[in-house]
From Swiss-Prot:
Glycosylated. Palmitoylated. Participates in the reverse transport of cholesterol from tissues to the liver for excretion by promoting cholesterol efflux from tissues and by acting as a cofactor for the lecithin cholesterol acyltransferase (LCAT). As part of the SPAP complex, activates spermatozoa motility. Belongs to the apolipoprotein A1/A4/E family. Homodimer. Interacts with APOA1BP and CLU. Component of a sperm activating protein complex (SPAP), consisting of APOA1, an immunoglobulin heavy chain, an immunoglobulin light chain and albumin. Interacts with NDRG1. Interacts with SCGB3A2. Interacts with NAXE and YJEFN3. This is Apolipoprotein A-I. The keyword RNA-binding does not apply. It is found in: Secreted. The lineage of its organism: Eukaryota, Metazoa, Chordata, Craniata, Vertebrata. Sequence repeats lie at residues 67-88, 89-110, 111-121, 122-143, 144-165, 166-187, 188-207, 208-229, 230-240, 241-264. It comes from the Eukaryota.
Length: 264
């Protein structure tokens, strides 16, 4: 599972950077991120599971049981891949329809975000300027101490650490002060965004278009279920031989073990 966790963590980190609030490039759509995450997670689980199965079959117990789990796992993986290929166009159509139906709401929220961005930008620039000034002051204070360390070598290391400690604490305290000021400055805009979002959602709920959207969403889900049903049934049929083979191998292993015990 470590590989799965690492894969998911990498996806979230890169995704959060790609959708940074202040970036200028067009961000990836939410639906594309959902699809990419699902695909990456399934692939990670499948690959990690295969590694565990391979390790078990290579063990002494796995060789003794001879369940042929790896062959069954590969067959299962092929069936799942086939299902994904069959459902690909169906799910794509569903996401496209849903994205189209909610386009107006995203446009309104983007307008609100752009307005807030322009208003808070001066505060962010001021915060960045003050922080750079603090770092520069810290650097100027530390630089003579670094020179002193190079000249005095090890005997002055402890003395240098004692001198650096209050400087680091001073930088930390100043940073906290600037962050608190920035948080206070941005709080009204954060509250305003929450109020606007609540207003948008309330207006959406009370509007006639909400019932229409709900009907469209229900229709899209119904269509998705109908189109996915044959593919899921095919997957079930494809898994039957795998399950039967696994059952037969397991029963055979138990029978062999019983014979060995009775012959002793």
């Amino acid at each position: 599972m470590k590989a799965v966790v690492l894969t998911v963590a990498v996806l979230f980190l890169t995704g959060s950077q790609a959708r940074h609030f202040w970036q200028q490039d067009d961000p990836q759509s939410p639906w594309d991120r959902v699809k990419d995450f699902a695909t990456l997670y399934v692939d990670a689980v499948k690959d990690t599971g295969r590694d565990y199965v391979s390790q078990f079959e290579s063990s002494a117990l796995g060789k003794q049981l001879n369940l042929k789990l790896l062959d069954n796992w590969d067959t299962l993986g092929s069936s799942i891949s086939k299902l994904r290929e069959q459902l690909g166009p169906v799910t794509q159509e569903f996401w496209d329809n849903l994205e189209k139906d909610t386009e107006w709401l995203r446009q309104e929220m983007n307008k609100d975000l752009e307005e807030v961005k322009q208003k808070v930008q001066p505060y962010l620039e001021e915060f960045q300027k003050k922080w750079q000034e603090e770092v520069e002051r810290y650097r100027q204070k530390v630089e003579p101490l670094s020179t002193e360390l190079r000249e005095g070598a090890r005997q002055k290391l402890q003395e240098l650490q004692e001198k650096l400690t209050p400087l680091g604490e001073e930088l930390r305290d100043h940073a906290r002060t600037h962050v608190d000021v920035l948080r206070t400055q941005l709080a009204p805009y954060s509250d305003k965004m929450r109020e606007r979002l609540a207003e948008r959602l309330t207006a959406l709920k009370d509007s006639a278009s909400f019932a229409e959207y709900h009907a469209k969403a229900s229709e899209h889900l119904k269509t998705l279920r109908e189109k996915a049903k044959p593919a899921i049934e095919d997957l079930g049929q494809g898994l039957l031989p795998v399950l039967e083979n696994l059952k037969a191998s397991f029963l055979s292993a138990i029978d062999d073990a019983a014979k060995k015990l009775s012959s002793q």
